Amino acid sequence: MKFLDLAKVYIRSGSGGNGCVSFRREKFIEYGGPDGGDGGKGGSVWAEAVDGLNTLIDFRYQQHFFAQNGVPGKGQQRSGKDGEDIVLRVPVGTEILDEDEETVLADLTEVGQRVLLAKGGNGGFGNLHFKSATNQAPRRANPGQAGVDRTIWLRLKLIADVGLLGLPNAGKSTFLAATSNARPKIADYPFTTLHPNLGVVGVDNVEFVIADIPGLIAGAHEGRGIGDRFLGHVERCAVLLHLVDGTSGDLVEDYHTIIGELEAYGGDLAGKPRVTVLNKIDTLDDEERAFLVEELETASGGPVMMMSGASREGVTEVLRALRARIDANRLREKPVEESQPWQP
């Protein structure tokens, strides 16, 4: 399924049905009086977060969503039928923005969370409502209230426990493929990953979700490369995993490039808990490993771990370090498979 994390949508709630002008007409009843019914309410437009979706691709093929209008009232005091609501089903983690793309109208972060986007119009009163002591036969009724037209933006920010960061070709997708059932595209050229990938990782009977976003380059926050538009997907992460390519010519510069982009992007990304890892150590000897780790620790001011996604050396230790930094309430117990009773 193709990935889409931003969509423009046009919505309209239903108009209310018109009230009815009608009079009771029966045999032997000369002055029956008014009996016009009210119009039905127009349908409303809602957005609801549902499970099982991680893209807004459906909104590329349908951008217009119009709720039903209410049915006009009828004689014999019959009210019109209400218009049916329409529900936009979106992935968990979807932000709903106003037309200016800045004002946040709602943030759907839980399954089943629902928000009203456009309320349907009220139905008009029939002429029965206007009967009074001085006006026994009113010939007026109210029109239904008009529906609401508006344009909104849907912006998806994936909800994951860990966000994978690094320059292009730092080995992020290789790490995700080695630790989960996710199968991102892996190749020996920059920007192999063109959209975020999610993988469920298990360690010590606990599972958590890792998001792999396209690699960042210097100036990404100004629109260079493709990574800056995906940084929003790691805003919700509890911890960031920063992979530094051990085969790079200047890994300290690589480290500062990513940190600089986090600071320039804002949103407190640079202040999130972070695990820094020297990757691709399968290509380094012991002396090179020690030298590069010391360089990175000096640059980062904190501990640096080592691993190789290709050979899986050090991967388990990195996963345990991530688990220790994720809030306990965000971790899920790994389901234990029930053993089947032996049968001959």
Swiss-Prot record:
Top EC class for this record = hydrolase
Identify the InterPro entries for this entry.
Answer: G_OBG, GTP-bd, GTP-bd_Obg/CgtA, GTP1_OBG_dom, GTP1_OBG_dom_sf, OBG_GTPase, P-loop_NTPase, Small_GTP-bd
Amino-acid biosynthesis as UniProt keyword: no
Signal peptide position in this chain?
none
Localization (cell): Cytoplasm
What EC number(s) is this enzyme filed under? 3.6.5.-
- What's one GO MF term for it? GTP binding
Binding-site residues, GTP? 166-173, 191-195, 212-215, 279-282, 308-310
Provide the OBG-type G domain boundaries. 160-327
Q: Which UniProt keywords apply?
A: Cytoplasm, GTP-binding, Hydrolase, Magnesium, Metal-binding, Nucleotide-binding
What is annotated about its quaternary structure and interactions? Monomer.
Protein name as annotated: GTPase Obg
Biological source species: Ruegeria pomeroyi (strain ATCC 700808 / DSM 15171 / DSS-3) (Silicibacter pomeroyi)
